[in-house]
């Protein structure tokens, strides 16, 4: 190697006479240009001769391998990323140096790539489907266990970690997403969780949507979800939203989906893209006013469907409709039920008078329905109005005009409210049921106090009191309304 001040190659030394000889050889070709710096940090120059004693400054194995990250030093493979569409705008493809041994030690996919039966010997490997930032995050983790992810890179890093089978980095990505999960991004993250098969993250997204349904469906990401994700959400019994508002949300989604499919936004096309999702809206849970103001005028339902639903709202006996009438109970935990009678007898008649019983509880609960006795004459349909009234204020907190079918046994049959009804501790309420149908079974040997116990919760204590008036004969001792169905 020439030292500073020495003569240039091919030139005579100063003060010496040039002797004749053969012509000088042509100058060597210029060295190839160094690779362009990465947009994510400059690459080190190619080091064919190792830096002397760099190891002495690195006290730990982690420091030594971290020093080799994204470095040409001792590297034996390069990855070419950013080819194809968008590469020119990003300054061309990026070449990232790496070390086969380190990659194979951290990833079964890299191990197979370099050491398996179809191992590659190429010094450059193209990765057209991987983002440079995500790939560098993967390499950084393999070299140093360091995690560098952010809102802009977490999804591509998760994809890359899955592609190269690095579950520890996957877990860090999922943890990052979980910490940043909110109602306004729950649908976006749910779509990604389903795409990347992350059931734990998907479950957390669904829980967030359950608790904050209105905020979640109001976010921009809601209209971007796919039809399968939409149906998965609409099937849930735990959404906390009025059904009329949920219908408005799926109409917005249908309009966006028509545009994605380059279809005219017409009533017919909205119905077409909704498909099964439309049948998952629980129209019977709406009031007749909500139905008339929204779905009936939307043009998405057929005339026959609109007529059948109006009949369902207005006439008795109610015609069957092809829509779910099970309430969406936006409550956590397990459903509970208490029965206030110890024995069942036959023949309880109905003449239009309501069966009533008063009760209090010692803790806050949410009542979702009653269990009622059915016919002594075999399979029968009943029409029924159920209510819960706050006794002192004479305020109706919830009611439902509905029906139920019984099989002639002495069992109870569930009749549910459209929405959960909050019951406060030590406040007196009246449970009311007005039945139309044949004579039924009834309960006897009633209890004034019923205690419900669960391993995970404290005791729920019900106290029962007879209501003033006729009440069709129902009292503490005997009558109808044997069961209260609730959540704590």
Curated annotation (Swiss-Prot):
GO biological process, one term: cell differentiation
Coiled coil: none
Any single Gene Ontology cellular-component annotation: nucleoplasm
UniProt keyword list: Cytoplasm, Differentiation, Methylation, Myogenesis, Ubl conjugation pathway
Chief location: cytoplasm
One Pfam short name: PHR
Pathway: Protein modification; protein ubiquitination
Tissue and organ expression note: Strongly expressed in heart and skeletal muscle. Weakly expressed in myoblast C2C12 cells, but strongly up-regulated upon their differentiation into myotubes.
Location of the BTB domain: 75-151
Compositionally biased tracts (Low complexity): 1-19
Every BACK domain range: 190-290
MF GO annotations: cullin family protein binding; identical protein binding
Biased segments, Pro residues type: 20-36
Cell location: Cytoplasm
Quaternary structure (record): Interacts (via C-terminus) with TOP1. Interacts with TRIM5 isoform Delta. Interacts with CUL3.
Protein name: BTB/POZ domain-containing protein 1
Protein species of origin: Mus musculus (Mouse)
């Amino acid at each position: 190697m020439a030292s500073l001040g020495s003569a240039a190659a091919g030139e005579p030394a100063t003060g010496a006479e040039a002797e004749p000889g053969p012509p000088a050889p042509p100058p060597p070709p210029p060295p190839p240009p160094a690779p362009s710096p990465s947009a994510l940090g400059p690459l080190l120059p190619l080091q064919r001769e190792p830096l002397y004693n760099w190891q002495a400054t690195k006290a730990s194995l982690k420091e030594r391998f971290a020093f080799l990250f994204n470095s040409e030093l001792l590297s034996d493979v390069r990855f070419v990323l950013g080819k194809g569409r968008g590469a020119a705008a990003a300054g061309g493809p990026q070449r990232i140096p790496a070390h086969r041994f380190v990659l194979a030690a951290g990833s079964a996919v890299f191990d197979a790539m370099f050491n398996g039966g179809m191992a590659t010997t190429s010094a450059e490997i193209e990765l057209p489907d991987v983002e440079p930032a995500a790939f560098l995050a993967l390499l950084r983790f393999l070299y140093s266990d360091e995690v560098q992810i952010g809102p802009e890179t977490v999804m591509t890093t998760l994809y890359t970690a899955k592609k190269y089978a690095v579950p520890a980095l996957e877990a860090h990505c999922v943890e990052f997403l979980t910490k940043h999960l909110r109602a306004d991004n729950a649908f976006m993250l749910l779509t990604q969780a389903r795409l990347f098969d992350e059931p734990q993250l998907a479950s957390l997204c669904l829980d967030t949507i359950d608790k904050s349904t209105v905020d979640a469906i109001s976010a921009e990401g809601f209209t971007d979800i796919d039809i399968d994700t939409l149906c998965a959400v609409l099937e849930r019994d735990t959404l906390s939203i009025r059904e009329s508002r949920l219908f408005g949300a799926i109409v917005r989604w249908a309009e966006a989906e028509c545009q994605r499919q380059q279809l005219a936004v017409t009533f017919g096309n909205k119905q077409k893209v909704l498909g099964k999702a439309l049948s998952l809206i629980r129209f019977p849970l709406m009031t007749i006013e909500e139905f008339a103001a929204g779905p009936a005028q939307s043009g998405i339902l057929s005339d026959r469907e609109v007529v059948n639903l109006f009949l369902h709202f207005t006439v008795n006996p109610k015609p069957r409709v092809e829509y779910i009438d099970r309430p969406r109970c936006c409550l956590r935990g397990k459903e509970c039920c208490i029965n206030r009678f110890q024995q069942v007898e036959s023949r309880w008649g109905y003449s239009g008078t309501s069966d009533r019983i008063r009760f209090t509880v010692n803790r806050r609960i949410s009542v979702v329905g009653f269990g009622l006795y059915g016919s002594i004459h075999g399979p029968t349909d009943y029409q029924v109005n159920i209510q819960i009234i706050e006794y002192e204020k004479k305020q109706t907190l919830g009611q439902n005009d509905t029906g139920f079918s019984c099989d002639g046994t002495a069992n109870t049959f569930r009749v549910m409210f459209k929405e959960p009804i909050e019951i406060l501790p030590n406040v007196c309420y009246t449970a009311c049921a007005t039945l139309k149908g044949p004579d039924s079974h009834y309960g006897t040997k009633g209890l004034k106090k019923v205690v419900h116990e669960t391993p995970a919760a404290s005791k729920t204590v019900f106290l029962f009191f007879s209501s003033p008036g006729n009440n069709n004969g129902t009292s503490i001792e005997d009558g109808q309304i044997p069961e209260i169905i609730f959540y704590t």
